[in-house]
Design a protein with these regions (language model features):
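Short, charged beta-turn/beta-strand-edge "cap" motif at the junction between a beta-strand
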Residues: 37-42
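Compact nucleic-acid interaction/catalytic patches
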Residues: 44-88
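Residue-level recognition of conserved beta-strand positions in structured domain cores
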Residues: 36, 70-71, 98
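Loop/turn positions that initiate beta-strands
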Residues: 28-31
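Short alpha-helix capping/helix-loop boundary micro-motifs
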Residues: 15-22
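C-terminal terminal-subdomain/extension
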Residues: 1-11, 83-148
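Extracellular/periplasmic catalytic domains that process cell-envelope and extracellular macromolecules
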Residues: 25-26, 88
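Short hydrophobic-aromatic micro-motifs
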Residues: 33-34, 57
């Protein structure tokens, strides 16, 4: 299947120049539909004319930047997938290996709040991935021990 990068580029320009009077207010633990675009390789693509995909807000850094994890309707038995059932009783998965930073301009609409237990489990999974690769000390290391 040929990817329409030109169409995504036009949508990306529209998103970048949008100055909505009513900005969304995403909160951690909530699933939102976002314009994530056409990606390269095995990264999760958006669908529809606006290249949308549901994502979970993992961390809010400020009113404009967020860490999100994309959702998939396909559950898989990999350690970087977090499989669960959404509020509509559909099996879905968070693809934690595809954690990414996105701008507020990509957020379209709120879907639902992830349960406390699922959110805590996903955060523990992400933390586990980060702890597997210990920071090196020495040149370039400026943070306190255990800063991550």
């Amino acid at each position: 299947m040929q990817k329409d990068f030109d169409k995504w580029n036009e949508e990306k320009k529209r998103l970048d120049s949008s100055e909505s009077e009513k900005r969304p207010f995403p909160r951690e633990q909530w699933v939102w539909v976002c314009s994530v675009g056409i990606n390269i390789g095995f990264e999760q693509n958006g669908t529809s004319n606006e290249f949308e995909r549901p994502v979970l807000v993992v961390k809010k850094f400020n009113n404009k930047m967020y860490w999100v994890v994309p959702l998939s309707s396909k559950q898989k038995p990999f350690d970087f997938y977090y499989n669960f059932t959404d509020p509509s009783e559909r099996p879905v998965a968070l693809i934690s290996s595809q954690l990414r930073l996105i701008s507020i301009q990509r957020f379209k609409r709120e879907m639902y709040k992830l349960s406390d237990i699922d959110f805590d489990n996903l955060r523990a999974q992400l933390k586990g991935f980060l702890e597997k690769s210990k920071p090196r000390t020495g040149r370039g290391f400026s943070g306190p021990e255990g800063a991550l």
